[in-house]
Amino acid sequence: MSVKARRISGRLETVVTKVNYAFDPVDDDKIIRNRLLTRTTTTRGEPPLKKLQKKFTSFVLEVDKEEENYNDCGRLAKAFLQELSTFEIPLLKSQAVVEANLREKESFNEVKDETERQIMQAKAEIEDLKKQLEESKIDRQHKEECETIRKLISAQPPRSETEKVIYELNKEIAELEAESTASWRLLELRKKQFALLMHVVDELQNTMEDEQKSLVDEIRSASEDQRNITDAMSVD
């Protein structure tokens, strides 16, 4: 799997492409490690480093011979240099691959940093949206409450009618208070009249009792006088 980055509308977009391997990923790692160590481009054949070693060994052995073998030494030296040149090409390719991998890694890190930045920005935007949502909910609730109050107010009668009703009620209350005051005064007057009547009744009753006592005393006195006269006549 390889990761590539491309810029679309001012932002980096990560493109992931899937590669189908002929070997298991674990085997791939072993093969790649072996190729990097031996500089081989295929899994078959003799490693270039070993071939270079053989060429160098053949050249050294030929040089160590105590014979006039300049032609063979030249031939082996030329073969060794050719093999060395052939071995250098994969090294340059590997170096180019390493540099490309480093550039790709750097690009991947940039994409990663940009992605993390975008994630953090998205999280911040989500938090802001959450706050805005809560604020909008509160505003909506306030609007609904205001609408409910407005409906209640609109359902009430006009102010002029209310003031008229209040005026009529105050007038009725004043009349009731006046009637109550008049009733209280009349009640007080009736209380005083009743008290005076009771006093007069008491005086009449006392007078009648006194008159009855006087009448009884007069009758008793007349009876005694009559009795005395009768007694006197009897004695004569």
From Swiss-Prot:
Primary subcellular site in the record, as a coarse category: nucleus
Keyword presence, Coiled coil: yes
Keywords (A to Z) from UniProt: Coiled coil, mRNA processing, mRNA splicing, mRNA transport, Nucleus, RNA-binding, Transport
Pfam families the record matches: THOC7
Coiled-coil regions, chain positions: 99-228
Localisation per UniProt entry: Nucleus
Taxonomic superkingdom: Eukaryota
Record-linked InterPro entries: THOC7/Mft1 (IPR008501)
GO biological process: mRNA processing; mRNA transport; RNA splicing
GO cellular component: THO complex; THO complex part of transcription export complex
One GO MF term attached to the UniProt entry: RNA binding
Record flagged with keyword RNA-binding: yes
Family statement drawn from the similarity comment of this UniProt entry: Belongs to the THOC7 family.
PANTHER family cross-referenced by the UniProt entry: MAINTENANCE OF KILLER 16 MAK16 PROTEIN-RELATED, THO COMPLEX SUBUNIT 7 HOMOLOG
Binding partners and assembly: Component of the THO complex, which is composed of THO1, THO2, THO3, THO5, THO6 and THO7.
Function: Acts as a component of the THO subcomplex of the TREX complex which is thought to couple mRNA transcription, processing and nuclear export.
Protein name: THO complex subunit 7B
